[in-house]
Amino acid sequence: MMCSSLEQALAVLVTTFHKYSCQEGDKFKLSKGEMKELLHKELPSFVGEKVDEEGLKKLMGSLDENSDQQVDFQEYAVFLALITVMCNDFFQGCPDRP
């Protein structure tokens, strides 16, 4: 049976997290360095050419609910939900929505 588009998208969200989280330290959490690399490589149109260090520090601080200096999967999922809401809001203002 073929996976639906949404199921494929969910699989990509999960595998992308683990692709970066296993590089250093706790393999189930993103360190600041892992998060920076994920943002740079996977969301280039959101962060531009270079990840802003001050912006990354603020982002990590706002995502890191338990203050362990890392982003766990639940915190990552909240981040993706926020980006998804922003994209939805943006496209609602476009005459030819995707």
Curated annotation (Swiss-Prot):
Induction: By growth factors in early G1 phase and probably by cell-cycle regulation in S phase. DNA methylation probably plays a direct negative role in suppressing S100L gene expression in tumor cells. Ca(2+) 1 binds at residues 29, 34. A subset of epithelial cells including normal human mammary epithelial cells and keratinocytes. Gene3D superfamilies: EF-hand. Ca(2+) 2 binds at residues 64, 66, 68, 70, 75. Homodimer. Interacts with FKBP4. Interacts with PPP5C (via TPR repeats); the interaction is calcium-dependent and modulates PPP5C activity. Interacts with TPPP; this interaction inhibits TPPP dimerization. This protein binds two calcium ions. May function as calcium sensor and modulator, contributing to cellular calcium signaling. May function by interacting with other proteins, such as TPR-containing proteins, and indirectly play a role in many physiological processes. May also play a role in suppressing tumor cell growth. This is Protein S100-A2. It comes from Homo sapiens (Human).
